[in-house]
Amino acid sequence: MAIFISVPSYKDPLLTETLCSAYQNAKFKKNLRFCVLDQSEHGIEIDKLVFKDQIIYENVPPVISKGVCWARSRIQEYFENEEYYLQIDSHTIFQENWDEILITYHDWLKAQNNDFVISSYPRAFTCNKTLTEFELDTKFQGTYGMSFKKGDVFKYDIVSIQTAIPTSSSEPLKGHLVAAGFLFSSGNFVKEIPYDPEYYFHGEELAIAVKLFTRGWDVFHIPRTPLFHLYTDVENLPRDLHWNPKDEENRIKKWTELDAISKKKIESLFSGEVDGKFGLGDKRTIKDFGIALGLDFEKKEIVSPDLAFTESRFLKVINESVPFASVLADNK
């Protein structure tokens, strides 16, 4: 039951820590297959890792990078029909037995759902300035749903800023939005919802969500996600961002141009002008997607604040034959 793990990284000093954390905390270590696109000047010492044979590693200069979606798309080219697909960021810490937990979640949900992804903003971790000590936020035991941030709806034309909504649910919830830094699914996701390399940053998650919806896929948020993400203010980041001025000086295609192309592509997606594998599906409509989220994408208006901003949109998942509590009692 192999897991293909997509890890794009941009000059991230936590890349090695992320890889080691995933490997060391996995129950079935031999089933992991990492694919890393390291956008940095010097790269990391892959040969020193005991699991180096399980890593596909590509190191490219930052000046040729075209953004995170370009990186995720390039990584997906190495997918070889693994049973599961895990997409993360390069500043992630894993809980013990995370792989068994995610697969158990997936199999429990699959009993009543065909095509779906498990995704949400993970709980946080913090670290010291030398990146040697880590503190995981394990206090929250509920489920983080995903919604929109008040005041930032349609902030970038069609794109709104997303946020996590803490709920008291101890069981999975059905939602509609995804987090690009944590997405777990069957390997079919790579085949049916491949990443468009022309997306840049803003709109990445919305584009994936609307493609999932219109192609008949569902989204589930899970309790106690077994991995943790580094959330920091830009001023305190221990790494450079893609639009760092120093990198921009030598970059052939500037980030502003990449961002403009991306926004135009996302607008075209919502107007139905994108065909083929990067386009929408025909199982459900954009109008229905908007109704579910409390938004009107055509008019760019909020039609239901409750659906847009609160947990009232989330649906509990019921499996009467196998109660959820019986399958994941150890995930705490």
Which residue ranges define each predicted feature?
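Non-catalytic, C-terminal membrane-associated alpha-helical segments of glycosyltransferases
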Residues: 272-332
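Catalytic cores of eukaryotic secretory-pathway lumenal/extracellular enzymes that build
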Residues: 2-296
